């Protein structure tokens, strides 16, 4: 086996020292930035773009599910249904007619 060159160990230690110094400086800059601008951060990716794309695809999927559920309900029920956003995750909601209360009974 070939032995490493005599200066290789020194170069490696020098690299490690430089990288440690750069990391320390980076942490200091990030800390100063967050102190000067609370709530500000450096985005490392573009999650908003991906989230918007996912939300749009999810909306289309839900719309297709709502349409299918509505068609199924109208075909298999005598009631009337509408598509409506629901707090409980229902895709469609039944529409119930309002009936006038019966007149008071005379005695």
UniProtKB/Swiss-Prot annotation:
Paired cysteines (S-S): none
Keywords associated with the record: DNA damage, DNA repair, Nucleus
InterPro entries: SOSSC
Entry annotated with the keyword DNA repair: yes
DNA damage found in the keyword field: yes
Compartments where located: Nucleus
Protein origin, superkingdom: Eukaryota
GO cellular component, one term: nucleoplasm
Gene Ontology terms describing biological process: DNA damage response; DNA repair; response to ionizing radiation
Family, similarity comment: Belongs to the SOSS-C family.
Function: Component of the SOSS complex, a multiprotein complex that functions downstream of the MRN complex to promote DNA repair and G2/M checkpoint. The SOSS complex associates with single-stranded DNA at DNA lesions and influences diverse endpoints in the cellular DNA damage response including cell-cycle checkpoint activation, recombinational repair and maintenance of genomic stability. Required for efficient homologous recombination-dependent repair of double-strand breaks (DSBs).
Subunit structure, as described in the record: Belongs to the multiprotein complex Integrator. Component of the SOSS complex, composed of soss-b (soss-b1/nabp2 or soss-b2/nabp1), soss-a/ints3 and soss-c/inip.
Name of the protein: SOSS complex subunit C
Organism: Salmo salar (Atlantic salmon)
Lineage, highest ranks first: Eukaryota, Metazoa, Chordata, Craniata, Vertebrata
């Amino acid at each position: 086996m070939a032995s490493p060159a005599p200066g290789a160990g020194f170069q490696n230690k020098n690299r490690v020292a430089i990288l440690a110094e750069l990391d320390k400086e980076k942490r200091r800059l990030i800390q100063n930035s967050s102190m000067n601008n609370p709530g500000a951060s450096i985005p490392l990716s573009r999650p908003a773009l991906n989230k918007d794309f996912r939300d749009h695809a999810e909306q289309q999927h839900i719309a297709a599910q709502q349409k299918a559920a509505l068609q199924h309900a109208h075909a298999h029920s005598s009631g009337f249904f509408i598509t409506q956003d629901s707090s409980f995750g229902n895709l469609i909601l039944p529409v119930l007619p309002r009936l006038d209360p019966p007149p008071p009974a005379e005695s």
